[in-house]
Amino acid sequence: NPALSYLDPSQVGALKVYAGIAPVSVGGDSIGGSIIAETAEPVFAAPGQGSLVRGEAGAFYRSNGNARGANLSATYATESFSISYTGATAQSDNYEAGGNFKERLFGAGNDPAFTGRPGHALSRDEVGSTAYETRNHTLGVAFRGGSHLIEAKLGFQDMPEQLWPNQRMDMLDNVQQRL
């Protein structure tokens, strides 16, 4: 599955795109290009500010595929300490094409929704295996002193399904834990 499909957009601080052959400093072993995704830097209170508290909430809905999701983040920081949480969930059913694009399979007598797999039917404008469901959580802690920064992030991703339309390589019940 495409590597960027694992990312929660609300946790991305910056994206860098290298077209063509990438420099050795960013991997260097790609021919068609590289995309570098970086998480957001920790936030600290300004000198003399005391403590900093901030949060963000968002949601989306797209009618095609009934796609929906939400994200939440919260940060508490002083001049030298920062703790943050980000969480997001997203899911979608199969999406629909702009019109009927599938022909009847295996003869004129078949149900128009027949897919070639017994007991499985899709409408003629439905793009099969495009559904997904994912949940992401990250807890970050950082300490800053002078020009030094110590940062740790704990992450958990639960991806019950990420289907793949052009290959039979659907991902089911994938769980990732990272430090």
Q: Locations of the language-model features?
A:
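Outer-membrane beta-barrel signature, preferentially recognizing the C-terminal barrel domain
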Residues: 18, 169-179
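A beta-strand signature from Gram-negative outer-membrane beta-barrel systems
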Residues: 5-56
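Short beta-alpha junctions and helix-cap segments that line functional grooves
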Residues: 1-3, 21, 71
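Alpha-helix N-cap/helix-start motif
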Residues: 24-28, 67, 94-95
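A generic helix-loop boundary/linker signal
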Residues: 5, 25, 64, 128-131
